[in-house]
C-alpha cells in the first residue's frame, strides 16, 4: 500500500511495505529509491527488482506519479512533460490506454479514450481514438468521434463565436453537414 503526501509542491512517498535492502535486482515486496547514472530517479514499490505498485519517477523535468506493473506504467497515473504538457488517466504497459485527459501547455485539452496502445509523446499524439472532447485554449470545442488522432465520425465543433458545425467528419474535415 502506498500513501502519498504533497508538501510545498514536492511529493513525499510513504509505503506500508518495508524498506528495500540488499541488491537492487533482488528487491521484492519493498519500498525504495533507485537512481541511475543518467539521472533517472524512482521512489516507490518494487517486486522482483522491478518497479511494481505505486511510485514516482523523475528525469530531466519529466515526472510520473502513479501505478507500475512489471517495470511499466500501468493503471492510474499522471505524467508531466518538461514542456508543461500533462496526461492524467489510465495506462497499459507504458502507454496511454483507456480514459484519460491530455492537457497541453498552451491550454488545449483532450478528454476521452485512448485505444491504439502506442507510445505517446507531446509530438506524437495520434492516439485520440473513440469518443472524446477536445477543448482549444481559445474556447472552441469539438465533441465527437476520433480516429488516429483526427476528428472522424459523428461530431459537433462549436466555435467561441457561436458558430456550430455538426455532422460526419473524416480525417479532420466535415464531409456530411447536418
Where are these regions (language model features)?
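Sec-dependent signal peptide recognition
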Residues: 1-3
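Glycine/tyrosine- and acidic-biased, solvent-exposed loop/turn segments at the edges of beta-strands
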Residues: 6-178
Amino acid at each position: 500500500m502506498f500513501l502519498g503526501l504533497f508538501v510545498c509542491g514536492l511529493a513525499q512517498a510513504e509505503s506500508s511495505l518495508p524498506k528495500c535492502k540488499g541488491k537492487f535486482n533482488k528487491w521484492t515486496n519493498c519500498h525504495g529509491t533507485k537512481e541511475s547514472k543518467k539521472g533517472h530517479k524512482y521512489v516507490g514499490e518494487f517486486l522482483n527488482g522491478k518497479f511494481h505498485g505505486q511510485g514516482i519517477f523523475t528525469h530531466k523535468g519529466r515526472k510520473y506519479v502513479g501505478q507500475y506493473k512489471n517495470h511499466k506504467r500501468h493503471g492510474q497515473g499522471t505524467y508531466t512533460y518538461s514542456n508543461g504538457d500533462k496526461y492524467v488517466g489510465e495506462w497499459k504497459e507504458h502507454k496511454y490506454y483507456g480514459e484519460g485527459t491530455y492537457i497541453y501547455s498552451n491550454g488545449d485539452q483532450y478528454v476521452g479514450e485512448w485505444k491504439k496502445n502506442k507510445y505517446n509523446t507531446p509530438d506524437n499524439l495520434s492516439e485520440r481514438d473513440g469518443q472524446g472532447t477536445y477543448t482549444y485554449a481559445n474556447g472552441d470545442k469539438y465533441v465527437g468521434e476520433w480516429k488516429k488522432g483526427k476528428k472522424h465520425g459523428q461530431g459537433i465543433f462549436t466555435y467561441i463565436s457561436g458558430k456550430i458545425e455538426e455532422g460526419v467528419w473524416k480525417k479532420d474535415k466535415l464531409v456530411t453537414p447536418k
